[in-house]
Amino acid sequence: DKQAQYSFIAEAQERGYDVLEMDGQLDNHFISWFESKNQGTRFARVDADVIDKLIEKETKRKMALTTVQQDLLRPVFDAQLPKDDKMHFNVVFEPLDEKQQPVVITQNEFMRRMKDMAAMGGGGMPFYGQMPDSYSVVVNGNHPLVAEILDEVEKGYGADELKGINKKIDTATTDENNLNELLKDKKEEEIAQAEKDKRTELSKKLDELRKERTARLEELGRGNKLVGQLIDLALLAGGMLKGESLNKFIRRSVEMIEK
């Protein structure tokens, strides 16, 4: 769809890639057949992934965010994603160029192709048509606005409080890993009841700590207008922002401009 996928097409063309328009009813079947007959040839929609990963490169760009920082930001973005039984969103972080979009929403090529074929009654896998649409919310870990959001989240949580909960999680994780290492060579019936109780206790404690941190991060995310704006811009680029959500986006945009 040249209109709905315009931003993805434009970015691909700016990189010097040729983009084929394949919107016929049989095109899904044709490209699958063509790929099977030509080893090493692969087709992908322009919105199947971020432009840096549509065609894999040997050189990898460095990620500005640490794994811990990504874990902090994931619930923040999750909090403002659409809640719909027909759509599933998964937040991932990629080391894109800082001048690229801060948030991009993509849809897995395989799942998209299977659902399209299922809709036509082909592919031999009709159950794909009953599955929710699955999207990746790709957050650009090198974008200045993402760094700004991280700073706001850390300040909003409180440096000492965040450090404290992270330390508790790290300690509980270490304790659980140590116990699992101790028990790894034992069969379940060989594990003493006290050890089983300890394992359950550690697992429950770690789960509660993570839920506590996630709940606080989601609260901060829901109140962050910049997060909502970036997600809505990505949804808008993918043609998925409509109705009430579109109206809220317009109102928020006006408020942010007035400031």
PLM region spans:
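Long, intrinsically disordered, charge-dense linkers/tails
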Residues: 1-259
